[in-house]
Amino acid sequence: MIREFSSLQNDIINIQEHYSLNNNMDVRGDHNRKNTSFRGSAPAPIMGKQELFRTLSSQNSPRRLISASYFSLESMVVLVGLTASLLILPLILPPLPPPPFMLLLIPIGIMVLLMVLAFMPSSNSKHVSSSSTFM
């Protein structure tokens, strides 16, 4: 058991060193990777066995709050109800006649408007910074 903790501790320290080196390289903007060594950074603080166990047990905790999950309970009820109604209503309702042609143009017009707005340049060009480039 002690050997497992020491091996795990070494792995965690190696990951921390790798992460800190990657962050330092990103901040500096240094793209010369020839001189990079994973042991060259400042040593990570060594954690005790109890501290290591606490961090591991808190990460793999099986107890999770409903509010911390991706969907809340209320949204799950709404999604299940909407799904059930979309599956059941077409079986119950009689076939409906198609809507008038002008009514079909409304969603097409909304889509065209959204595409025009999406490709329109921003009117506030003073606040555009050069750090917002993604490439």
UniProtKB/Swiss-Prot annotation:
The Gene Ontology biological process annotation of the record reads:
multidimensional cell growth; organ growth; positive regulation of organ growth; response to brassinosteroid
**Any transmembrane segments, and where?**
76-96, 100-120
Residue ranges the record marks as coiled coil = none
- UniProt induction comment: By brassinosteroids.
Which InterPro entries does the UniProt record give?
A: ARGOS/ARL/OSR1
Q: Where is this region: Organ Size Related (OSR) domain?
A: 71-122
- Keyword field: Cytoplasm, Developmental protein, Endoplasmic reticulum, Membrane, Nucleus, Transmembrane, Transmembrane helix
Tell me, what does this protein do in biology?
A: Promotes cell expansion-dependent organ growth, probably via a brassinosteroids signaling pathway. Acts downstream of BRI1.
By what name is this protein known?
ARGOS-like protein
- State the organism named in the record: Arabidopsis thaliana (Mouse-ear cress)
